[in-house]
Curated annotation (Swiss-Prot):
Organism for this UniProt entry: Haloferax volcanii (strain ATCC 29605 / DSM 3757 / JCM 8879 / NBRC 14742 / NCIMB 2012 / VKM B-1768 / DS2)
Job of this protein: Converts molybdopterin precursor Z into molybdopterin. This requires the incorporation of two sulfur atoms into precursor Z to generate a dithiolene group. The sulfur is provided by the thiocarboxylated form of SAMP1.
Keyword Transferase in record: yes
Position(s), cross-link Glycyl lysine isopeptide (Lys-Gly) (interchain with G-Cter in SAMP1): 240, 247
PTM comment text: Sampylated at Lys-240 and Lys-247 with the archaeal ubiquitin-like proteins SAMP1 and SAMP3, which may regulate enzymatic activity.
Organism phylogeny: Archaea, Methanobacteriati, Methanobacteriota, Stenosarchaea group, Halobacteria
Pfam families found in the cross-reference section: MoaE
EC numbers for this chain: 2.8.1.-
Keywords: Isopeptide bond, Molybdenum cofactor biosynthesis, Transferase, Ubl conjugation
Entries under PANTHER family matching the protein: MOLYBDOPTERIN SYNTHASE RELATED
Full protein name: Probable molybdopterin synthase
GO molecular function, one term: transferase activity
Residues annotated for substrate binding in this entry: 156-158, 168, 224-225, 240, 247-249
This protein's pathway: Cofactor biosynthesis; molybdopterin biosynthesis
C-alpha cells in the first residue's frame, strides 16, 4: 500500500481530488481533534461497528495510533491518503509552506496542486507492507488452489541479545533503489522452482524501525507444510546473506553502522 500525507489548509479536499486519480482501492485518514473522537456512550466496549446488508460499515474505537491503523489498512487497500499528520514518517505534500517531517512536494493552495503529478509521486515511494499484506497476496495467487500450507517468517527489532547489552532503540535500513528488490525477486524465483513450492514473497522495510517493530517478512505458499517450512527458512537465510541492505543501530549509548563493526 502506497501512502501519501497532505498537510495545510485544504488537505482533506486535496485528498479527495487525488483519490479520484488513483487506480486501485483508496483509504483516506483524517486527523481529528480529540473532542471529535470521544465516544457517544461508555458501555465498556473498546470498539463499535455498524454493518448494513449491502456491506457498508462504520466504526469507532480507542487505543489506535497511525502506524497501527496503516498496518490494518495495508492488506486491503492499494493507497492511503493522510490528511493533517505533519509528524508522520511518510512522504508528505505541504500546502502554503506548512512544516512537516518528510516533505516531497509543495503547493501554494490545494486548488493549485497538480494531482496528476502527485498521483505519479505516490507510486515512486516505498510502499507500506505488513506480513498480512503478503499473506493476502499469496491467498489471491492463481496457484492457491493447489496450496495446503502458508508458512511465514517475521523479523523484528530485538532490544537486547543479553542482559548486559545496552538496549537497542531503533535500527535504520538503507538500500540501493531497485537492487535489493531485484535480488529478492531472483531468490524468490529460484525457490519457486522447487517441487511443491508455488509462490515466495519477501519484503524488507527501509528507514527507521523502532524497538519491537517488524523489519522483514517472508511468505511461502506451498502444497504441503514440509516444503513450506524448509523454503521459508532458506528464504530468510538467503535474504540476509545475499541482499545488499545496510543497517545502522542506535542504542542508549551509541550509534553505528553494523557493517563497519
Amino acid at each position: 500500500m502506497h501512502v501519501l500525507g497532505i498537510v495545510g489548509a485544504g488537505a482533506t479536499t486535496l485528498c479527495d481530488r487525488l483519490a479520484a486519480q488513483l487506480d486501485g482501492r483508496v483509504a483516506t485518514v483524517e486527523s481529528l481533534p480529540e473532542s471529535a473522537t470521544e465516544p457517544e456512550s461508555t458501555d465498556g466496549v473498546a470498539a463499535a461497528y455498524g454493518l448494513s446488508p449491502d456491506g457498508n460499515w462504520v466504526g469507532s474505537g480507542d487505543d489506535r495510533d497511525l502506524d497501527g491503523l496503516l498496518d490494518d489498512l495495508s492488506a486491503e487497500y492499494d493507497y492511503a491518503l493522510l490528511s493533517g499528520f505533519p509528524d508522520a514518517r511518510v512522504p508528505t505534500v505541504a500546502l502554503a509552506g506548512v512544516d512537516a517531517a518528510n516533505v516531497v512536494a509543495e503547493a501554494e493552495t490545494a486548488d493549485a496542486a497538480d494531482v496528476a503529478s502527485l498521483a505519479a509521486e505516490i507510486d515512486s515511494h516505498e510502499p507500506h507492507v505488513t506480513l498480512e499484506t503478503l499473506v493476502e497476496r499469496a491467498k489471491a495467487d492463481p496457484l492457491e488452489v493447489y496450496a495446503g500450507a502458508i508458512a511465514t517468517f517475521t523479523g523484528r527489532v530485538r532490544a537486547k541479545e543479553s542482559e548486559d547489552d545496552d538496549p537497542t532503540l531503533s535500527l535504520e535500513f538503507e538500500k540501493y533503489d531497485g537492487v535489493a528488490e531485484s535480488k529478492m525477486d531472483a531468490i524468490s524465483e529460484e525457490l519457486e522452482a522447487r517441487d511443491g513450492v508455488l509462490r515466495v514473497l519477501m519484503h524488507h522495510r527501509v528507514g527507521v524501525v523502532e524497538d519491537g517493530a517488524d523489519i522483514v517478512f517472508v511468505v511461502v505458499l506451498a502444497g504441503h507444510r514440509r516444503e513450506a517450512f524448509r523454503t521459508v527458512e532458506d528464504g530468510i537465510d538467503r535474504l540476509k546473506d545475499e541482499v545488499p541492505i545496510f543497517k545502522k543501530e542506535t542504542t542508549t549509548d551509541e550509534e553505528f553502522w553494523v557493517h563497519d563493526r
